[in-house]
Amino acid sequence: MKKRVTIYTDGACSGNPGRGGWGALMMYGTVNRELSGYEPATTNNRMELTAAIEGLDALKEPCVVDLYSDSAYLVNALNQGWLKRWTTNNWTTSAKKSVENIDLWKKILKLVTLHQVTFHKVKGHSDNPFNNRCDELARQAIKNNS
């Protein structure tokens, strides 16, 4: 039976584009693990995707995952079928434009085939302590690299 893991993620950018950070909080049973990172030149959406990638990539074996993010971009792409349509349409949007962040979406595709992931949208900057912690991790990563 696969382990059930909860992951909260968030990305932040100082300027968009600008310096960026991401944070992830992984929870399995009584064990919590925090991850974070920094990019010198990026966008908020790239940081949101990177947080999810890093959280999922840190899992040592295939798991059942509940992933919580305040990024509508990330959650809607998976839950509303955007990602599936983009791959079917050779990475073009319904407006016939090239999909942004293809490199990261390809990594997410690989990870969601390895793990059984359910994506959940949470309200950002509200009263969710786990999402707020991820925001702190992302912003601290930017601050630590200033």
UniProtKB/Swiss-Prot annotation:
It is an enzyme of class 3 (hydrolase). The keyword Magnesium applies. Mg(2+) 2 binds at D10, D135. Its EC number is 3.1.26.4. GO terms for cellular component: cytoplasm. One of its GO terms (molecular function) is magnesium ion binding. PROSITE patterns: RNASE_H_1. Its main location: cytoplasm. Keywords: Cytoplasm, Endonuclease, Hydrolase, Magnesium, Metal-binding, Nuclease. It catalyses: Endonucleolytic cleavage to 5'-phosphomonoester. Mg(2+) 1 binds at D10, E48, D70. The keyword Iron does not apply. Gene3D superfamilies: Ribonuclease H-like superfamily/Ribonuclease H (3.30.420.10). Belongs to the RNase H family. HAMAP family: RNase_H. Endonuclease that specifically degrades the RNA of RNA-DNA hybrids. This is Ribonuclease H. It comes from Chlorobium limicola (strain DSM 245 / NBRC 103803 / 6330). The gene is rnhA.
